[in-house]
A protein has these predicted regions:
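N-terminal chloroplast transit peptides
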Residues: 1-21
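Serine/proline-rich low-complexity intrinsically disordered segments, especially terminal tails, linkers
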Residues: 9, 13, 24-26, 67-68, ...
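Intrinsically disordered, low-complexity, compositionally biased regions/tails
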Residues: 6, 14-16, 31, 105, ...
Length: 505
């Protein structure tokens, strides 16, 4: 994507824009890493110490209205709701960030790619000034998450969609196999700081989960030595998702309810005990997740795609992507935002239903009603009462977004069809791909539109569903792209017959 001329210009820009602080950061990157990269980090003067960047909790309603009410909370406070019961949002001092121009930020973020200097080797913490600027490097709990590849879906785009510029952001290529790592590194790092400042304020961290959040929470808490508790809906997550928190030492509670029931319970528990809430109702996680949007811009050499399609369940991630793109636009790193698509499973589609009733996003809030989610292969988005509904609606309105749905057969067929072109998709990515197929069929998305599908988890976490599909063992589903194994005898003739049949030899 990047030409030699562009690379030369970028290199020149880095040299021209280098300040004493950025040059010191670059010098660290050029040195050999010490045995203890945390100790090495302590020897540096962090960028945020040289500047006056800060962040705090404010009511999300202030962000919606564009008017600051004056209500705010320190990120060191254990607080999840505003005084009126609404959600909170992490608000950055944009004026302070804007004092350093877009060339400065682009050069700084680009310079941190590929380093092992703590903590900037992480795709999240390479944007630390835009995430948690006041956090000490020594408090950070990171597994060098992020920096996931942007897969050019050349063959799938051409053959299935007639598209020339289709990409898949592989957020599932991460430590625990899902995008949830991006948010959990931020939340657990802040908890690590709070526990040091106020030793008895937090005894454990808990979450309700459809599988991926619990895996990320348990892994990051284990790395930090912090106890974790996960509430899982019984028999509604994959075996791979279940075993992850068990292996990482979490207290795993398998509860006879759905995700929404687990969510109600964890909110009650965290309200009455010193257990910290890790669900996306806590906006700290969204600060990490927004960095995937910034990564996409970096990977396109700071060019903005036309469309970004995101699977939606609890709906925090679409707001996180919106926030990342919005910050880049407001600070001048790019001059526009992509249009956003929220893709929901038909069996858990309250936002899609509201979008259809409202005939668009303008009056979508008035049309919204929670639903009772039905079973879906896309189990991580099997949510009927999403916590971040207001966040998602704001994102869709501001980004001229749309909402699409996918049936069980559509999502499984889309995932399997794309798998045949070199991918290995989770069912949630199948939802997004199925939505894209529909939008192309209606010509909402053009053949030459640069489009990014966000893949939220690794397909290996959902191997059971793939086995069922390719075995044609899914009731009431034709499984048209199934590729079942062929059983043959230990005989050359039988083997040759199978090969000839397959390849018409």
């Amino acid at each position: 994507m990047r030409t030699l001329q562009q690379s030369t210009l970028r290199s020149g820009a880095r040299q021209a824009m280098a300040t004493p602080c950025s040059r010191s950061v670059q010098r660290v990157f050029a040195t050999a890493a010490h045995a203890d990269i945390r100790r090495e980090a302590m020897l540096r003067v962090p960028l945020e110490k040289a500047h006056t960047f800060n962040a705090k909790f404010v009511p999300f309603s202030d962000i919606q209205s564009g008017h600051m009410s004056g209500e705010s909370y320190s990120l060191d406070d254990v607080v999840y709701r505003s005084r009126d019961g609404g959600l909170l949002d992490v608000h950055h001092d944009m004026k302070a960030l804007a004092q350093y121009g877009p060339d400065y930020w682009r050069a700084l973020f680009d310079a941190r790619i590929g380093t092992t200097a703590w903590p900037f080797g992480s795709g999240v913490w390479s944007k630390k000034e835009w995430v948690l600027p006041g956090l000490s490097d020594d408090d950070i709990v990171s597994m060098f998450e992020g920096n996931s590849n942007l897969f050019w879906a050349e063959r799938f785009g051409k053959e299935a969609l007639g598209m020339t510029d289709l990409w898949v952001k592989q957020c599932g290529n991460s430590h625990t196999g899902s995008f949830k790592d991006l948010g959990m590194t931020v939340l657990v790092s802040q908890v690590n700081r709070i526990r040091k400042l106020k030793p008895r304020s937090i005894t454990a961290v808990g979450c309700a989960s459809t599988g991926d959040t619990s895996a990320a929470l348990s892994a990051y808490c284990a790395a930090a030595g912090i106890p974790s508790i996960v509430f899982l809906p019984a028999d509604k997550i994959s075996l791979a998702q279940l075993v992850q928190p068990i292996a990482n030492g979490a207290l795993v509670l398998s509860i006879d309810t759905d995700f929404d029931g687990c969510m109600r319970l964890i909110k009650q528990v965290t309200a009455e005990t010193p257990i910290y809430l890790a669900n996306s109702m806590n906006s700290l996680r969204l600060e990490g997740q927004k960095t995937a949007a910034i990564e996409i811009l970096q990977q396109f050499d700071w060019q903005v795609p036309d469309w970004v399609i995101i699977p939606g369940g609890n709906l925090g991630n679409i707001y996180a992507f919106y926030k990342g793109f919005k910050m880049c636009k407001e600070l001048g790193l790019v001059d526009k935002m992509p249009r956003l698509v929220c893709a929901q499973a038909q069996n858990a589609n309250p936002l899609y239903q509201a979008f259809q009733k409202a005939h668009g996003v303008a009056d979508i809030k008035e049309s919204y009603q929670a639903v009772k989610a039905k079973t879906t292969f896309a189990s991580a988005i099997q949510i009927g009462d999403p916590v971040s509904i207001d966040r998602a609606i704001m994102a869709l309105k501001d980004a001229n977004g749309i909402v699409e749905e996918a049936s069980e057969e559509e999502l499984m067929d889309a995932a399997a069809r794309a798998d045949r072109t070199g991918m290995f998709n989770c069912p949630h990515t199948g939802v997004a791909l199925a939505a894209l197929l529909k939008l192309r069929e209606r010509q909402v998305i053009g053949p030459n539109d640069r489009t990014v599908v966000v893949s939220t988890a690794h397909g290996l976490k959902f191997a059971q569903s793939k086995v069922a599909y390719h075995s044609k063992a899914v009731p009431n589903m034709t499984c048209q792209f199934a590729n079942p194994p062929v059983q043959v005898k230990e005989d050359l003739g039988a083997v040759m017959d199978a090969i000839k049949t397959k390849f018409s030899l």
